[in-house]
Amino acid sequence: MAQRTRLGDLLRPLNSEYGKVVPGWGTTPVMGIFMVLFLVFLLVILQLYNQSLILEGINVNWNGAG
């Protein structure tokens, strides 16, 4: 038998929608938008690392903090 805890009682309302499926696409388009934004973020980081994206006046040194 599961033990009841105060934390479990506080979190129970968050789990009240468990098993229910929203008809249609739901929040899938929002997830897609965030995935694309994250991909763009990763591409910018990669380009900064490869120095293929050069920002004027900003020196990027990957040799360490010293």
UniProtKB/Swiss-Prot annotation:
Protein name per Swiss-Prot or TrEMBL: Photosystem II reaction center protein H
Domain of life: Bacteria
One Pfam short name: PsbH
Subcellular location: Cellular thylakoid membrane
Gene: psbH
GO BP: photosynthesis; protein stabilization
Membrane topology annotation: Single-pass membrane protein
InterPro entries: PSII_PsbH, PSII_PsbH_sf
UniProt cross-references to NCBIfam families, sorted A to Z: PRK02624.1
GO cellular component: photosystem II; plasma membrane-derived thylakoid membrane
Residue ranges the record marks as coiled coil: none
Family statement: Belongs to the PsbH family.
Record key words, sorted: Membrane, Photosynthesis, Photosystem II, Thylakoid, Transmembrane, Transmembrane helix
Subunit field text: PSII is composed of 1 copy each of membrane proteins PsbA, PsbB, PsbC, PsbD, PsbE, PsbF, PsbH, PsbI, PsbJ, PsbK, PsbL, PsbM, PsbT, PsbX, PsbY, PsbZ, Psb30/Ycf12, peripheral proteins PsbO, CyanoQ (PsbQ), PsbU, PsbV and a large number of cofactors. It forms dimeric complexes.
Job of this protein: One of the components of the core complex of photosystem II (PSII), required for its stability and/or assembly. PSII is a light-driven water:plastoquinone oxidoreductase that uses light energy to abstract electrons from H(2)O, generating O(2) and a proton gradient subsequently used for ATP formation. It consists of a core antenna complex that captures photons, and an electron transfer chain that converts photonic excitation into a charge separation.
Record-annotated membrane-spanning stretches: 29-49
GO MF term set: phosphate ion binding
